[in-house]
C-alpha cells in the first residue's frame, strides 16, 4: 500500500455532524468526509482560492488536490440529494496551527489543547483513556448518542419531551 502524503490543514469545522431534520441518525446512511477533503472544499469553494495556490497551501500536487476536491464534492452532493448524514472526521493530515483544536476525555472530563505540531492524540494525557473526542469551537458537533441508542422512540428516551418537541406539539 502506498503511503498517503499528509495534507496540511489550517482550519477545522465548528460542527462535525450534519443530518436531515426530523430523521433519527440511526435511520440514516452516513457520508464520511475527511478533514483534508473539507479543507479542499473550504479553500476552493468558500475562500475561492485558485487550485494551484490551494494545493500549495495543503502541501500536495494540483492533481492530488483536484482528486480530493472532486471526492469531497461528490460525497456532499450524494448526502444532500439522497438524504444522508454527513460526518466530518478522520484522514491523514497535519494541523498547521492556524486553528485551535481542543479535546475532551469522556472518562475524566479533562479538556486540553495539543501542541500544533502534534498529530491527533490517541489517549488522554491526564488518565490515559482512549475515549477522547475533538471539540469543534464551543463544543458543538459532537455526535449525540445517549445511552447507546439514538432513536427517540427506543427505551423511553427523555428526548421526546425536549423543549423543541414541546413547541412542535403545541
Curated annotation (Swiss-Prot):
Transmembrane region(s): none
Taxonomic superkingdom: Archaea
Disulfide bonds: none
Pfam families according to UniProt: DUF134
Coiled coil regions, renumbered to chain: none
Family: Belongs to the UPF0251 family.
Name of this protein: UPF0251 protein MA_1017
Organism: Methanosarcina acetivorans (strain ATCC 35395 / DSM 2834 / JCM 12185 / C2A)
